[in-house]
């Protein structure tokens, strides 16, 4: 192995370590309702899904991807977030699903900016939507932005449509062949029943789970993972 090859390999290993560290940081953040995991095939691509718990988008389930730039984190280029289904939101491009991040992250600052901050921003623009709109100065969807200010009932109608669309696609087959793609399975009493009962009894930590199949489950009609019944 030449010196140049060794340096290149070392640089790749260090970069992978930094990406892994970014993912590990998520464990210390309050990202309730938002789930991400790096692709098995490509650590620069992360799969995500957010279950919105409040605001106009409540009960919405929206899939997205996070793409890290080639030189991450030592690059001023901001990661790219793309929503996978039509999401009617002032910050989401209606044609390609790209989330507008320029206002929140004008450029990426290594050591100062982290992926968890980007994910927190995604949480914020859905769960605290009205607060966000009171501060927003940029838009990727002018129709959504103008309707919010000029015709609130029509805006909410379109939001409800995209919420229903996201719910209807929750169980769609994975569009890519990747072991880490987040897939949801319909509730199965034999497989998921013991976990649900333990959750209801406050004994989730005592459950012995079988080997992972790569699937998560959501009770049909209740759009929260591992939902408890009242």
Curated annotation (Swiss-Prot):
InterPro entries: Ub_conjugating_enzyme, UBQ-conjugat_E2_core, UBQ-conjugating_enzyme/RWD
Ranges in coiled-coil conformation: none
A Pfam match: UQ_con
Gene3D superfamilies cross-referenced by the UniProt entry: Ubiquitin Conjugating Enzyme
Residue span, UBC core domain: 14-168
Disulfide bonds: none
Superkingdom in the source lineage: Eukaryota
Recorded family membership: Belongs to the ubiquitin-conjugating enzyme family. FTS subfamily.
Protein name: Protein crossbronx homolog
């Amino acid at each position: 192995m030449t010196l140049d090859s060794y340096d290149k390999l070392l640089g790749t290993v260090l970069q992978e370590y930094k990406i892994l560290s970014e993912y590990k940081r998520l464990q210390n953040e309050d990202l309730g309702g938002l789930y991400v995991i790096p692709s098995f095939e490509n650590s620069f691509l992360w799969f995500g899904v957010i279950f919105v718990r409040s605001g106009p988008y409540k009960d919405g389930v929206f899939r997205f991807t996070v793409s890290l730039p080639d030189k991450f984190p030592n690059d001023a280029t901001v990661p790219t977030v793309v929503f996978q289904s039509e999401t009617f939101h002032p910050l989401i491009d209606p044609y390609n699903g790209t989330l507008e991040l320029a206002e929140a992250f004008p450029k990426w600052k290594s050591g100062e900016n982290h992926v968890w901050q980007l994910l927190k921003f995604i949480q914020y623009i859905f769960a605290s939507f009205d607060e966000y709109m009171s501060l927003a100065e940029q838009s990727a969807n002018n129709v959504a932005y103008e309707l919010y200010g000029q015709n609130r009932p029509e805006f909410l109608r379109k939001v409800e449509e995209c919420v229903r669309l996201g719910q209807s696609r929750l169980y769609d087959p994975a569009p890519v062949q990747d072991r880490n793609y987040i897939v949801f399975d319909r509730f199965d009493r034999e497989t998921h029943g013991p976990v649900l009962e333990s959750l209801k009894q406050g004994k989730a930590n005592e459950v012995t789970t079988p080997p992972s199949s790569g699937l998560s489950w959501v009770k049909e009609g209740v759009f929260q993972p591992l939902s408890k019944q009242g």
